């Protein structure tokens, strides 16, 4: 398995092309060889290809806006082909951070054709979870279960986010096992406690989640890319947080 950096962690430094270029260099200087492109400014596919090459990085996953996926599926795939990325991601189900029966049904209706087209063109479609997918629909089933059942494994993969699974009160390792063969990419994100009984995101190894076990289960489930993400670094420098996570994972023998 390969360690990667989810660029959403350092999105505030990639709001324009110059900043994006410098961000890629800084991430590479930490030691990362792969990235997920998400939360950055807009870019042309050829520009990204050239910037990745300059920094010695490869892009293994993206997050693409829902409208672009629905309205321009073929162009999205063509762009990914330019910068040699086979994995195309959706960051969340459209719905403003919540899900209802109606929102879920529209999601399936809108994205089943997208998933089929992406597969037809030789790419893979990935869905990134938050916590809301672990709420229950009117029939008593978890929405995450409904998603896994509605989309065949060959049409939908999952970017399992360890923090949000844990936040939802679910067992991370159990879900990695449950999605075995569909979790080529995993978002590694730690959870720490605070003195006011609130949880917060932390660099890997600086919280309380059992990442040695999570990583072991990920390997058994066929995961290829372990992508470090920290949505909020609070008072810390996001690049310093990425380095802390990188150093911890390297100490476990990962590259």
Segments from the language model and where they lie:
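Glycine/small-residue-rich loop that forms an oxyanion/phosphate-binding "nest" at active or ligand-binding sites
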Residues: 71-110
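Acidic-and-aromatic substrate-binding clefts and catalytic sites of carbohydrate-active enzymes
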Residues: 11-17, 34-47, 64-73, 95-99, ...
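N-terminal pre-domain/capping segments
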Residues: 1-87, 250, 254-255
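Short, electropositive alpha-helical surface patch
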Residues: 53, 61, 65, 140-152, ...
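Acidic/histidine-rich catalytic cores of soluble enzymes
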Residues: 120-208
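Conserved, mostly hydrophobic/aromatic
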Residues: 5, 27, 35, 52, ...
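Alpha-helix-loop-beta-strand connector modules within alpha/beta enzyme cores
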Residues: 48-64, 111-118, 145-153, 211-214
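Hydrophobic faces of well-ordered beta-strands that scaffold small-molecule active sites
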Residues: 3-7, 35-37, 59-64, 88-90, ...
